[in-house]
Amino acid sequence: MAKEKFERTKPHINIGTIGHVDHGKTTLTAAITAVLAVAGDTELMDYDAIDNAPEERERGITIATSHVEYETATRHYAHVDCPGHADYVKNMITGAAQMDGAILVIAATDGPMAQTREHILLSKQVGVPYIVVFLNKEDQLDDEDKEEMLELVEMEVRELLSEYDFPGDDTPIVAGSAFQALEEAKTGTLGEWSAKIMELMDAVDEYIPEPKRETDKDFLMAIEDIFTIQGRGTVVTGKVDRGQVCVGDEVEIVGLKDTQKTTVTGVEMFRKEMDCGIAGDNCGVLIRGIDKEAVQRGMVLCKPGSITPHTQFEAEVYVLTKEEGGRHTPFFDNYRPQFYVRTTDVTGSVKLQEGTEMVMPGDNVKINVELIAPIALDEGTRFAIREGGRTVGAGVVSKIIA
């Protein structure tokens, strides 16, 4: 566990990069940390450290969700670099769920692509409240029609955002080149391309408000990963959804199996020890007397009695169209997809409500769901509906039945 204390001096915001594969999300993440490091606000992370899951570099696509931290003059950011490839939408869902806002990266050379649309939709469904746009690869546009191209892409992006109920007309859009900015920062001086990155971060500072932290609500953290620390016990990691967790607190582990009670013996963030983790923090929580095998991804850590496991609920869902990457055909009563809740997939069967014969791609309907395993649920819990690894719908729990 960590030894250094984490100091809270600036407001803390969770942010991330989203967008189509190879439009430059990871390069931008590296450029932001590099430029801010030269500006004196941040320690440097190199590109490979961000693109750090072993399977990534063979295929040149980012698979795992990487976390980096950086600071602007006014804020501390935890930044997730979200996977861009459609195969990895599952990670996109866990990653995007950790954002107070997102930077949508679009190559000015291509304009919005299939996954640009998919990520905007997913951002809407998983509750990413604000998007700032970076038009990347400006250096690759021809000088004579550069202005025109940028204007065209900008118009297209604003329309696309509005289509998914984001305020397209008011969204900040900054053009630049992440690659050129990164090259500049490597020399230790900031030039015109770095200035674009600073402009982007100013837009992020101003446009993405400090989230209303849900610190006063009952503690809940979705468990993403589980480790054993020799001689100390079991550590569970995840993002604190709401409330706070402090050393000495009694907590429950809810979902999938019988509810277990335990006590928190340590909390850490970015390898630094803390007394408490609060809503919005990505942290590790050390729990007493619980075997690693007794905990799995998809369970939640929570204040005792605050949330209970359920298998049956009513939900409001949106079914993706074929164009959005969804089903090509309708589904009927007793349809059995996977329901992706917080950090895990659980199979469930769908009961259509009276008067509904079938559900077409593009429909927005109320359905009843029965899961094969209990999950910690309450009204307002969001989920994705998936089939064979691809997202075919999204929904929110409107009523608990059992």
Curated annotation (Swiss-Prot):
It is an enzyme of class 3 (hydrolase). It catalyses: GTP + H2O = GDP + phosphate + H(+). Disulfide bonds: none annotated. Residues 81-84 are annotated as: G3. Its main location: cytoplasm. Its EC number is 3.6.5.3. Residues 136-139 are annotated as: G4. GO terms for cellular component: cytosol. Residues 60-64 are annotated as: G2. Residues 177-179 are annotated as: G5. GO terms for molecular function: GTP binding; GTPase activity; translation elongation factor activity. Keywords: Cytoplasm, Elongation factor, GTP-binding, Hydrolase, Magnesium, Metal-binding, Nucleotide-binding, Protein biosynthesis. Mg(2+) binds at T26. Pfam families: GTP_EFTU (PF00009), GTP_EFTU_D2 (PF03144), GTP_EFTU_D3 (PF03143). It comes from the Bacteria. PROSITE patterns: G_TR_1, G_TR_2. GTP binds at residues 19-26, 81-85, 136-139. It is found in: Cytoplasm. Residues 19-26 are annotated as: G1. GTP hydrolase that promotes the GTP-dependent binding of aminoacyl-tRNA to the A-site of ribosomes during protein biosynthesis. Belongs to the TRAFAC class translation factor GTPase superfamily. Classic translation factor GTPase family. EF-Tu/EF-1A subfamily. Monomer. This is Elongation factor Tu.
